UniProtKB/Swiss-Prot annotation:
Residues 1-26 are annotated as: Disordered. Keywords: Capsid protein, Ribonucleoprotein, RNA-binding, T=3 icosahedral capsid protein, Viral nucleoprotein, Virion. Belongs to the alphamovirus/ilarvirus capsid protein family. This is Capsid protein. Pfam families: Ilar_coat. Its main location: virion. One of its GO terms (cellular component) is viral nucleocapsid. GO terms for molecular function: RNA binding. Residues 12-26 have a biased composition (Low complexity). It comes from Tobacco streak virus (strain WC) (TSV).
Length: 237
């Protein structure tokens, strides 16, 4: 009596499994499963994934419709933001101090020349300034009755007052406050003897008070502390 042995390694079970897979796949009677079809490059399975011309046309029409109705983002306007000007610090090193002097009013004149104030005139009469004083900065502020330019000029002697140099001069507007911080480089007074602040007004050069200054501030080397004479408290006949 023959007995059929059921087991995974028996040939009869393999034949039964192949038959079941063939029956499950009605499209191809040869391939066992999808992996077998890929290995064989079976045309019966490949036809399932083939895209027809109608499908391509429909996909192209759908893409064209989506593109036509898609919202295109509008470009955002670019607004330029001006950077604030760096503000100069008024703090000084420990070896420097500020001294100040009130500016005098300008009188009327009979000629249309430029206006100049020599640096030695600006610092004249300030008690803290001496022969050994070093000058580091000069601050000025003013309002003029006309547009024009101003700057610090070297070599101002006599009655001839040149225009402010192109490099280093600044412009100002009529009836608008303008200020400037001049760097003096720690020089002594005799080294700044021929230096002056020059104004070149476009019009109304002969009027009184054509330029009204807010005063002068000068950064100088710290003066030696004041001490009374040694014999100040010595009583004598």
């Amino acid at each position: 009596m023959n007995t059929l042995i059921q087991g995974p390694d028996h040939p009869s079970n393999a034949m039964s499994s192949r038959a079941n897979n063939r029956s499950n796949n009605s499209r191809c009677p040869t391939c066992i499963d999808e992996l077998d079809a890929m290995a064989r490059n079976c045309p019966a399975h490949n036809t399932v994934n083939t895209v027809s011309r109608r499908q391509r046309r429909n996909a192209a029409r759908a893409a064209a419709y989506r593109n036509a109705n898609a919202r295109v983002p509008l470009p955002l306007p670019v607004v330029s933001v001006s950077r604030p000007q760096a503000k100069a610090s008024l703090r000084l090193p420990n070896n420097q101090v500020w001294v100040t002097r009130k500016a005098s009013e300008w009188s009327a004149k009979t000629v249309d020349t430029n206006d100049a104030i020599p640096f030695k005139t600006i610092v004249e009469g300030i008690p803290e300034i001496g022969a050994e004083t070093k000058f580091f900065r000069l601050l000025i502020g003013f309002v003029a009755v006309s547009d024009g330019t101003f700057g610090m000029v070297d070599g101002v002697t006599g009655d001839v007052i040149p225009d402010p140099p192109v490099v280093g001069r600044l412009g100002f507007k009529k009836n608008t406050y303008r200020s400037r911080d001049f760097d003096l480089g720690g020089k002594l007074l005799n080294q700044l003897d021929d230096r002056a602040v020059v104004w070149c007004l476009d019009e109304r050069r002969r009027e009184a008070k054509r330029v009204q200054l807010a005063g002068y501030w000068i950064a100088i080397s710290k003066p030696a502390p004041l001490m009374p004479p040694e014999d100040f408290l010595v009583n004598q006949d």
